Amino acid sequence: MGALVLTGCSERQEASTTLPTTEAAPTTEALPTLGPADFPVPEEAREQTPEGAVEFVRYYVALTKHLAVNSRDPEPLLQLSQDCRTCNQIAQALTADLAASYSYREYAYEFDEYGPALVDGETAEVGFAYVQGPITAVDQAGQIVPDRSAATPEELQSGASLLWNEDLQSWVITGLTVG
């Protein structure tokens, strides 16, 4: 009986003409686009990490400029926030600018994070310095609108509270303090 088993294993076998594939099935799907089509939320800002939280706030600040300079509907600011009073005020100001046909000749700012975000599960806190200005808003006649402009740069100690939104696979801002 033992001889049969050994003999069967020692017989010559033809090699397979096909090799197993080494391609792995994709483990993650691409994230759906979030934000305006011409200024989407970058992938690194959609990571549930301290770095991702900082990049999300950096993006949100840049989005505000993008919408203002391009005279665009501020709806993306609202879509990327949740119960954020300051976010709502910014969106209302941009809506008022659109209604008044204001445009921006100049819109400079700097965003400097204080370090990594503090992440605790589904929430994060990001501290940053926001240097605003110069910003020059003009009316239809090209006249400067003083209450929508800032002639000299001003550093404002700022911060943001974030919540991870599983449906969006992104952070959303729940609180924003500028200054």
Provide a role label for each language-model segment.
Residues 2-55:
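Juxtamembrane and targeting peptides
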Residues 110-119, 162:
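Short amphipathic beta-strand and strand-loop transition segments with alternating hydrophobic
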Residues 94-95, 110-114, 144-145:
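Short structured motifs
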Residues 27, 109, 153-155:
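Short solvent-exposed loop/turn micro-motifs enriched in small/polar/acidic residues
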Residues 99-105, 115-116, 150-152:
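Short alpha-helical linear motifs
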Residues 35-106:
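Core segments of small alpha/beta cavity-forming domains
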Residues 13-14, 121-179:
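Exposed beta-sheet edge and beta->alpha loop/turn motif
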Residues 16-17, 104-109, 118:
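Short alpha-helix boundary/capping motifs
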